[in-house]
Structure formats: structure tokens, C-alpha cells
């Protein structure tokens, strides 16, 4: 699922319910100024959590959701100098929490095969129950 818009040479996109990503995904996200990217679950929390087996399999499957780790790896593939805002969203209430998503994504970027580090980009986590701050690009 994705929503994109462009105005005055500012490109932003929302990418949720991905399950996995591939070169097509990277190609469509790589030149953005801002991205809202799902960071749905921590794999360990999901595995030991309350979801029934079939639901765990769906979440982990190709049509499920990106884990924190995959979200970080995808960001490694799309980072560039003009990316001004990264917003992590669509966090599972049962299988994730804000600080874990944030730190895991930052770790993946810092360990990734990219010249960039997490400190080079503003990364925020969308709140589940309140409006996020306005992001000016």
C-alpha cells in the first residue's frame, strides 16, 4: 500500500503493508524527500507473543508487514542526501514499541552497507494515538 504526492519538487511517499521488499520497491522509494515507512513488529516479540500461529505466519509472510529489521534494511537502500524526513509507522501494539522500532532501525542503518549513518537523517516514530508533528520540507 502506498500513497505518494509531489508538490514544488518535494516527493513523499507512504509505504505500509509491504511484507517484503524488492528492487521495484527500492526503485519507487529511492528519490524521496520524505517517507513514512512501516516498522510493524519485532520478530522475537511476534514469535513469543499472543497471536495465533496462522496470524504470525501471515504477518511474517510476503503479504504481511515489515519487521523493524527489514524496515532498517530498506532505509539503507533508499538513503540519499535529499532525504529530509523518515517517519516510522504502522507499529503493532502487541509486537513492538516505539523505542525498540527506533533503535532497531538505527542499528540496521549504522551496520548497513551504506555511506550514511542513522544520525545523518531525522528519524521519528509516529504515535499510535496522537497526531505527529508537522514536517516542513
Where do the PLM segments sit?
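Single conserved hydrophobic/aromatic residue that forms the stacking wall/gate
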Residues: 1-11
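Short active-site-adjacent helix-start/loop capping segments
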Residues: 10, 96, 133-134
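Active-site-proximal beta-strand elements of phosphoester/diester hydrolases
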Residues: 12-18
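Cofactor-binding loop segments of dinucleotide-utilizing enzymes, especially the Rossmann-like FAD-
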Residues: 17, 91, 128
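Cap/insert and terminal regions of metallo-dependent hydrolase folds
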Residues: 23-124
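Short, basic/aromatic-enriched C-terminal tail that caps enzymatic domains
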Residues: 121-137
